[in-house]
Amino acid sequence: MPELPEVTTVINELKETVLNKPLDQVQVNLRKVLKNIDPQLLNKQLKNQFFTDIKRKGKYIIFLLSNGLYLVSHLRMEGKYFFEERGSKFNQKHVLVEFHFDDGSQLNYHDTRQFGTFHLYEKLEQAAQLNKLAFDPLEAGFDYRKIFQKAQNSKRKVKTFILDQTVISGIGNIYADEILFASKINPETMVDQLTIKEIEILCKNATKILAKAIVMKGTTISSFSFKKDHTGGYQNFLKVHTKKDQPCSVCNQLIVKKKINGRGSYFCLNCQKITTKVSTKLNP
């Protein structure tokens, strides 16, 4: 699933190709991707309008329209956007939504798994899925002290905790593994056992790693592509994710893979030891 760096990379590419181009037609080839509007009404609302800006919240893409509406897109597992110039040939298979512009070019939403979603809103406050999202590590409101407070009230493993989009938004399985490795935290550590200093280090690494991944245009492990024939580059910098049975870059011990709450997790047992918080209370 595309995570914060991949979604940001997609948005950066879209901004270069589709802003301020009048829409002539929106063609929906698979009805189920529209969650709160039918294809005919979507076409009516977008026809003759244009995208004035494109923003991100967590892993969501938000298209701002010239008529004040908001089109909210989530790529889910395999969603991709491909821009096509007028007259260009492309494979129509798996193109679920087509945004046709009046200059003959078009933006295609491509999704082999068909899990992606679209919502249209008059106001973003109506988008419940956005309202429940926490700050992401690149936002000004991201505060390790607030994360620590949430951790103190949680009985989950740290890997599961940081994947919760109501705790930290934008992080998925790939970057969770990398952030925990950089922070020397075992993914099975109970999060309420982490000290505030450990949470601070984790949050700083989250910001650092996600920012670097954006510079590298995301991570391509299986299929991520931000435009035709272009893939990300951060996979070349991964330390543990997908590295099962390969030597750790720090200590040379072999990286292990284990399912944690249903998610394949990669880590180094030597560099990422489970520790418990030492009590500062005096013995009676």
Curated annotation (Swiss-Prot):
Substrates-to-products reaction catalysed: Hydrolysis of DNA containing ring-opened 7-methylguanine residues, releasing 2,6-diamino-4-hydroxy-5-(N-methyl)formamidopyrimidine; 2'-deoxyribonucleotide-(2'-deoxyribose 5'-phosphate)-2'-deoxyribonucleotide-DNA = a 3'-end 2'-deoxyribonucleotide-(2,3-dehydro-2,3-deoxyribose 5'-phosphate)-DNA + a 5'-end 5'-phospho-2'-deoxyribonucleoside-DNA + H(+)
UniProt keyword annotations, A-Z: DNA damage, DNA repair, DNA-binding, Glycosidase, Hydrolase, Lyase, Metal-binding, Multifunctional enzyme, Zinc, Zinc-finger
Keyword match Hydrolase: yes
Cofactor binding comment, as recorded: Binds 1 zinc ion per subunit.
InterPro entries: DNA_glyclase/AP_lyase_DNA-bd (IPR015886), DNA_glyclase_Znf_dom_DNA_BS (IPR015887), Formamido-pyr_DNA_Glyclase (IPR020629), FPG_cat (IPR012319), MutM-like_N-ter (IPR035937), Ribosomal_uS13-like_H2TH (IPR010979), Znf_DNA_glyclase/AP_lyase (IPR000214), Znf_FPG/IleRS (IPR010663)
One BP annotation, GO: base-excision repair
Superkingdom field: Bacteria
Subunit structure: Monomer.
The protein's name: Formamidopyrimidine-DNA glycosylase
Organism whose genome encodes this protein: Mycoplasma genitalium (strain ATCC 33530 / DSM 19775 / NCTC 10195 / G37)
